[in-house]
Amino acid sequence: MREIVHIQIGQCGNQIGAKFWEMIGEEHGIDLAGSDRGASALQLERISVYYNEAYGRKYVPRAVLVDLEPGTMDSIRSSKLGALFQPDSFVHGNSGAGNNWAKGHYTEGAELIENVLEVVRHESESCDCLQGFQIVHSLGGGTGSGMGTLLMNKIREEYPDRIMNSFSVMPSPKVSDTVVEPYNAVLSIHQLIENADACFCIDNEALYDICFRTLKLTTPTYGDLNHLVSLTMSGITTSLRFPGQLNADLRKLAVNMVPFPRLHFFMPGFAPLTAQGSQQYRALSVAELTQQMFDARNTMAACDLRRGRYLTVACIFRGKMSTKEVDQQLLSVQTRNSSCFVEWIPNNVKVAVCDIPPRGLSMAATFIGNNTAIQEIFNRVSEHFSAMFKRKAFVHWYTSEGMDINEFGEAENNIHDLVSEYQQFQDAKAVLEEDEEVTEEAEMEPEDKGH
């Protein structure tokens, strides 16, 4: 079976990761002790993608849990999930990274990295045919961002032909924990551009907006935000975990979603959005799901979708529904909003349908969009970065860990390049909207692309 090794790193990564295992455990009928309590054979058909079967039919997550301080690990160990993971899967330091990317990437993280790679190798060796890795981390702190990207580089060196996916939580000024978040984020994105195959960008600002506007929560906690993220992660990985038709492995997902190697940053979305512990009172129709799924308010990345255009889209519908109706609804979205999809990638919306809905819902849909509007997130972070870097504020914390100041400039330039690449493809053939001669334009396109 095509296995995936899951790595959660840093406080944020570990908290979201724990939620993810709780949620997919419920979907596959695996209880907190790792035993099978499922009602359907489908639940176990592809269980080996994320779980190892140990003695006595106990299922153990293929997970590596990493942090530079013991706190989050201890709380996972003592939580209800504690007995699920293999004790060797926990790797932690004691000093912490102090929200400093350079500590995670060059000093503290570098000291621990060999221990982590040992566990990663051990997990990879127990796979029949490893398809790739997924890393869950945040970009605002020190460990998830600095050590997370270091780990990705090392795994890339050792497993160059395996797919590397990341679920990356982007910092936002509204939900800021530390002043140096823009530094940590830009330095991380600089690495992700080069070393990830697919990056699901989860933006704290968008998660807060969903909690306030849609779920009407007055004081959202990190638990509420993590619940939204785990819904999305469970949705995105559905076609990997259950027998389905489309994007059944990480490589196919990347091939369908990434038209140019650097443009691999996706915005996930989910419908229907429900708060933790709440029940949904009425089932939505396929039309309502489709409409909600494409609605910017349901997207986990805070940017204005009306300004951008979709390069590619993948949708995963879950529950008992007619595939024909799903296809019709998606077609009508594309015809009604044709200007939102680039016309030079025909059939750029892919869809999968899986019979098994998420727990507590009768139907749900997950959305993965590669939209040029994501440049707004990078712009936002890089503006804050530049404002501080002009004055060299806080830079001594990084250089004192042995980091070269030139790396800041390189990272800043790389992100500016990424933003202008998104802009270039957003504008490509924008003439079409005024011009009716669509077919002639399309025939001329290959020559236009040349220069």
Curated annotation (Swiss-Prot):
GO terms under biological process: microtubule cytoskeleton organization; microtubule polymerization; mitotic cell cycle; platelet aggregation; platelet formation; spindle assembly; thyroid gland development; thyroid hormone transport
Disulfide feature: none
Pathology linked to this chain's protein: Macrothrombocytopenia, isolated, 1, autosomal dominant: A congenital blood disorder characterized by increased platelet size and decreased number of circulating platelets.
UniProt record similarity statement: Belongs to the tubulin family.
Binding annotation for GTP: Q11, E69, S138, G142, T143, G144, N204, N226
InterPro entries linked to this entry: Beta-tubulin_BS, Beta_tubulin, Tub_FtsZ_C, Tubulin, Tubulin/FtsZ-like_C, Tubulin/FtsZ_2-layer-sand-dom, Tubulin/FtsZ_GTPase_sf, Tubulin_C
Keywords noted in UniProt: Cytoplasm, Cytoskeleton, Disease variant, GTP-binding, Isopeptide bond, Magnesium, Metal-binding, Microtubule, Nucleotide-binding, Phosphoprotein
Record PTM: Some glutamate residues at the C-terminus are polyglutamylated, resulting in polyglutamate chains on the gamma-carboxyl group. Polyglutamylation plays a key role in microtubule severing by spastin (SPAST). SPAST preferentially recognizes and acts on microtubules decorated with short polyglutamate tails: severing activity by SPAST increases as the number of glutamates per tubulin rises from one to eight, but decreases beyond this glutamylation threshold. Glutamylation is also involved in cilia motility. Some glutamate residues at the C-terminus are monoglycylated but not polyglycylated due to the absence of functional TTLL10 in human. Monoglycylation is mainly limited to tubulin incorporated into cilia and flagella axonemes, which is required for their stability and maintenance. Flagella glycylation controls sperm motility. Both polyglutamylation and monoglycylation can coexist on the same protein on adjacent residues, and lowering glycylation levels increases polyglutamylation, and reciprocally.
Chain segments carrying region Disordered: 432-451
UniProt cofactor(s): Mg(2+)
Motif (MREI motif): 1-4
Localization: Cytoplasm, Cytoskeleton
Name assigned to this protein: Tubulin beta-1 chain
